Amino acid sequence: MPQENNTFYITTPIYYPSGKLHIGHAYTTVAGDAMARYKRLKGFDVRYLTGTDEHGQKIQQKAEQENITPQEYVDRAAADIQKLWKQLEISNDDFIRTTEKRHKVVIEKVFQKLLDNGDIYLDEYEGWYSIPDETFYTETQLVDIERNEKGEVIGGKSPDSGHPVELIKEESYFFRMGKYADRLLKYYEENPTFIQPESRKNEMINNFIKPGLEDLAVSRTTFDWGVKVPENPKHVVYVWIDALFNYLTALGYDTENDELYQKYWPADVHLVGKEIVRFHTIYWPIMLMALDLPLPKQVFAHGWLLMKDGKMSKSKGNVVDPVTLIERYGLDELRYYLLREVPFGSDGVFTPEGFVERINYDLANDLGNLLNRTVAMINKYFDGQIGSYKGAVTEFDHTLTSVAEETVKAYEKAMENMEFSVALSTLWQLISRTNKYIDETAPWVLAKDPAKEEELRSVMYHLAESLRISAVLLQPFLTKTPEKMFEQLGITDESLKAWDSITAFGQLKDTKVQKGEPLFPRLEAEEEIAYIKGKMQGSAPAKEETKEEEPQEVDRLPEITIDQFMDVELRVAEVIEAEPVKKADRLLKLQLDLGFEKRQVVSGIAKHYTPEELVGKKLVCVTNLKPVKLRGELSQGMILAGEADGVLKVVSIDQSLPKGTRIK
């Protein structure tokens, strides 16, 4: 049972509704839902928040393009998002919209408080601005920098997304970020689990705090779609304050009705994508410090759900619509895949092949067949009746009982750390062990010997109880399947579906099983893989006809022997961090994970890739080159790339190959 304070407040980012949501957005929200359901199962009083970030220049421009008002645009978009959450059976307790009055009135108060405290001041700002990112950048932060004949910067791209930036000069209010830098570092030290995974914390400290925090622009005057600054209404409160404070405004903070704030704040965990870690672990805690408010207990930054060819985009024809998958395959199938396939703190790759395999092997074969066989045997041998637990009869019984009890402990540990894929993998070990138990005990042989009836009855009980425990553990992840399992096992007593009922083996008693429909019909793999690929390609714009390329003459190098080639050590390396090298427009500093060790490599690809495009990619690295220093940075190898028409492309590799694999 939970501790004395049994509340649990969990949030997702609020989504920016400038385009249709894809499976990557569903990933975050389903993960948050699984955690919320798990905590409810454990007896916690849970508050799960999600919502939409509805202000900003991009929204205003989108509305103008459609000849509608920004409010009409966001009303439609928010309705679509809420419809998707309903289809995913997200159990959120609230949906906050930043255009709601309850949000705007508090934002006005917060801004005024920060102004009165001297944390915000008015000045003029000139900087490079990316509209899609709604972010200002300094010259040193830009990538793909363009210069004129005098060497002056005349353009570049966002280091976060690769979008072009434009030089903007305007009056702005600024937040004194540097004032709180030391206090923030101290908080990191005193709260080592505040930022998870650990690698994200190191990135924040080394890349942003140690180099020095610059004051942050927190208002805009070049558009008017947003919350106005009360004493200076030509200014609109910028996204950093407007969006981040949703976690408080949804609880009624600084209003007469602040019961929810008093009950649930500080948040137990903010779930965010890794691209917005900085805003949640630097800007957000500093603003809370300025208001003398408690900080959230944890920010968990998960990775991206990628495709084989990188991030999802319509231009690549690799966008996956979650609704398409739900309608054809079912909701539980999608939810299971999302949380089983990818370690939550890392990037993962969606493949149609992997999706279909998870359904056929894990769900249909392992789980579905186990339930079908168990119910059929209990019906056949004991007219569907399950009695009470008599204890283990054989060593096989003892082993299965032990595995079940250890599974519950390991599952609980994984869930507390938000290791969803580990929790499901642990549960599937119990399911696999239960399948093996059938082969070990051979009930069909026991049934032929009347003297073995007690042993046979014990086998049937252990099968049913293992399935009941599995159904309880599935409840955070799957919304329909656990109830179908309880129904087929004849379980109507709600106490047998609760967490407390699985801490010790043997709680099931006096039920009658009933045959039901198969949980997961098996799919025709090739047909379904082709279907999903077709839907993905359908997301791409029509391609123009291309002329067939003529063969080109190339300069050939002298031939080498196989022994000479084998002297070059090529290995699969995953990019875990990437950043520009200071005062070097062409260089990126990459942190590579080789599986057996981590290395730093400096590569001359900064004009062709943003850091974010590389993080999560598996590349080919030459690992036995002598280390060198480039612009003062140690480089312990080289990544392979090819050049065509002046454009460099890194050599990527099948994402399923393990890190460190030798390439021959």
From Swiss-Prot:
It comes from the Bacteria. A motif ('KMSKS' region) lies at residues 311-315. Its EC number is 6.1.1.10. It is found in: Cytoplasm. It catalyses: tRNA(Met) + L-methionine + ATP = L-methionyl-tRNA(Met) + AMP + diphosphate. Residues 536-556 are annotated as: Disordered. Keywords: Aminoacyl-tRNA synthetase, ATP-binding, Cytoplasm, Ligase, Nucleotide-binding, Protein biosynthesis, RNA-binding, tRNA-binding. Residues 570-662 form the tRNA-binding domain. The keyword Chaperone does not apply. PROSITE patterns: AA_TRNA_LIGASE_I (PS00178), TRBD (PS50886). Belongs to the class-I aminoacyl-tRNA synthetase family. MetG type 2B subfamily. NCBIfam families: metG, metG_C_term, PRK12267.1. Homodimer. This is Methionine--tRNA ligase. The gene is metG.
